[in-house]
A protein has these predicted regions:
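Active-site phosphate/pyrophosphate-binding segments
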Residues: 1-21, 118, 124-128, 135-216
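Glycine-rich phosphate-binding loops that contact phosphosugars or nucleotide phosphates
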Residues: 18-149, 159, 213
């Protein structure tokens, strides 16, 4: 594991590769969902950098031809042990890409296989659960600013610094509402989450009883 900050990681990549053409986001399940805000941010703000997102095995078995030393591949797994994501990390490095992993666990296979690693919190509080997508978004912002410039760079950092405390402060207010919703819908076999386009990170339909303990 390296102890580099996000700014240091991106600066190191820029020093080795002055031109980056593509940023790929790779993960599975919830970790893939947590990468969507960063992908959406680059997609809507970058003028030159291209971006796309892949499930890990899609990346492994239908690898984009453009993955090379002009690519940054960002892989994400909470445990750092998701086999498909670890394999994607190895593959991306083999193809010459600059690979950054995002995980909660230092020393995990994802940490070991990536060129750079960003560690995040998760279990400490409700707010800490936002660290994974927040670190991915911060990384996307840093890449954009380093390679193209980003007018709202400082504002982004101010906002990201407030997220954890804001969520933790809101938890007492929303816990009773969440508990009531969970109890009233406990027997619902499926919970559908409606969405509209890119405004929501991923469409999900989940057995409600599976998420009940986390809801309350």
């Amino acid at each position: 594991m390296n102890n580099m900050s996000i700014q240091e990681i991106v600066a190191a990549i820029k020093n080795k590769q002055p031109e980056i053409k593509t940023v790929y986001f790779v993960g599975c399940g919830a970790s893939m969902s947590d990468l969507f805000p960063a992908k959406y941010f680059l997609e809507n703000n970058a003028k030159k950098l291209r971006t796309s997102i892949y499930t890990a095995n899609n990346f492994n078995y239908s690898t984009p031809a453009a993955v090379d030393n002009t690519s940054v591949v960002i892989t994400c797994s909470l445990s750092g042990g998701t086999p498909e994501t670890v394999a994607a990390t190895k593959l991306a490095r083999k193809l010459g890409a600059h690979v950054i992993s995002i995980t909660n666990k230092a020393g995990s296979p994802l940490d070991v296989e990536a060129e750079y690693c960003i560690l995040h919190g998760f279990y400490e509080s409700y707010g800490a659960k936002m660290e994974k997508p927040a670190r991915a978004l911060e990384l996307a912002c840093e890449l954009l600013n380093e390679y193209e410039g980003y007018a709202h760079y400082d504002d982004m950092h101010v906002g990201l610094a407030k997220i954890t405390d804001l969520i933790n402060a809101a938890v007492p207010m929303f816990r009773p509402v969440a508990k009531k919703f969970a109890e009233e819908n406990y027997n619902a076999p499926i919970l559908y989450v409606p969405d509209d386009g890119n405004a929501v990170v991923k469409r999900n339909h989940l057995p409600f009883r599976r998420i009940l303990p986390r809801t309350i």
